Amino acid sequence: MKNQSSFSIVALLLIFFSSSVFAQLQTNFYRKSCPNVETIVRNAVRQKFQQTFVTAPATLRLFFHDCFVRGCDASILLASPSEKDHPDDKSLAGDGFDTVAKAKQALDRDPNCRNKVSCADILALATRDVVVLTGGPNYPVELGRRDGRLSTVASVQHSLPQPSFKLDQLNTMFARHGLSQTDMIALSGAHTIGFAHCGKFSKRIYNFSPKRPIDPTLNIRYALQLRQMCPIRVDLRIAINMDPTSPNTFDNAYFKNLQKGMGLFTSDQVLFSDERSRSTVNSFASSEATFRQAFISAITKLGRVGVKTGNAGEIRRDCSRVN
């Protein structure tokens, strides 16, 4: 009985702590200190996006990687030695980092905003903006995060989903951050504007098993197309669009592709091949509105993961260095 009481107290404390942290995140957090923060960031992101489309997938992926390691505290942005030196982060495109840097520079040019907005919040805003720029849903971004002071290679180990993951592995990892299976599937939908390097999926098209060189869950025509784009013994760093039908548009085509066996990673295709998640894929494939609403909910929850607020952390003067 005593143990049960202790557990209940701990559980209540965790709920109270989580609620108090989330309560400190507000969409109008900078209304007095930097009232034009969203406009300034949006304009900087748009300018960067006009230079290269890679801005969009790079920024989205950067946000996800940041939040899944130590929480959404911009620790991924810190200079080496840091998280970005881990093999799972070395493929992060430089355009994502540059997007945040450009937005930070734009804010610092405004005397009212200089060193007032955290790099973590800049990344969260930039992520929303690239989603909108590619045709995705607009949504309010909760703000008030503080920047972390620690970033290590070791912290990335076993913290990010792998291309070979099956459903249970995906669910377990996302559940650690308070994200449901539906959240996980909705966030996977961001792959509609993503790209991947040949080395991340070559096993599926060349040596899946001794008897089956091609993964049987993979559409055979799609597999042969991938072989043409990723010839054997050629540079494994060649980048391939994860959505072969509308790679530059944030839509629900990703889920329609899964129905056809055209998920690039095992972790993509398993969302349809596993009957436990198939109905959600079918729902998102049949209704873009349903997907968009689920994505808004999921990315809002993602943006709350492990946030530092109040007096925790700092507001970095340089996003790549602690103060």
From Swiss-Prot:
Role description: Removal of H(2)O(2), oxidation of toxic reductants, biosynthesis and degradation of lignin, suberization, auxin catabolism, response to environmental stresses such as wounding, pathogen attack and oxidative stress. These functions might be dependent on each isozyme/isoform in each plant tissue.
Protein's UniProt name: Peroxidase 16
UniProt main location, coarse: secreted
Catalysed reaction equations from the record: 2 a phenolic donor + H2O2 = 2 a phenolic radical donor + 2 H2O
Keywords: Calcium, Disulfide bond, Heme, Hydrogen peroxide, Iron, Metal-binding, Oxidoreductase, Peroxidase, Secreted, Signal
Note: There are 73 peroxidase genes in A.thaliana.
Gene that encodes the chain: PER16
The species this protein was found in: Arabidopsis thaliana (Mouse-ear cress)
Sequence similarity: Belongs to the peroxidase family. Classical plant (class III) peroxidase subfamily.
Entry keyword Secreted: yes
Tissue specificity note: Expressed in the whole plant, but preferentially in roots and leaves.
A biological process term (GO) from this entry: response to oxidative stress
Secretion signal, residue range per the UniProt entry: 1-23
Disulfide bridge positions per record: 34-113, 67-72, 119-319, 198-230
Binding site for Ca(2+) 1: 66, 69, 71, 73, 75
Active site residues of this protein: 65 (proton acceptor)
GO CC entries: extracellular region
Pfam families: peroxidase (PF00141)
Top-rank EC class of the record's enzyme: oxidoreductase
Entry's localization field: Secreted
Binding site for heme b: 191
GO molecular function: heme binding; lactoperoxidase activity; metal ion binding
Site (Transition state stabilizer): residue numbering on this chain: 61
Residue numbers binding substrate: 161
Residues reported to bind Ca(2+) 2: 192, 243, 246, 251
Residue ranges crossing the lipid bilayer per the database entry: none
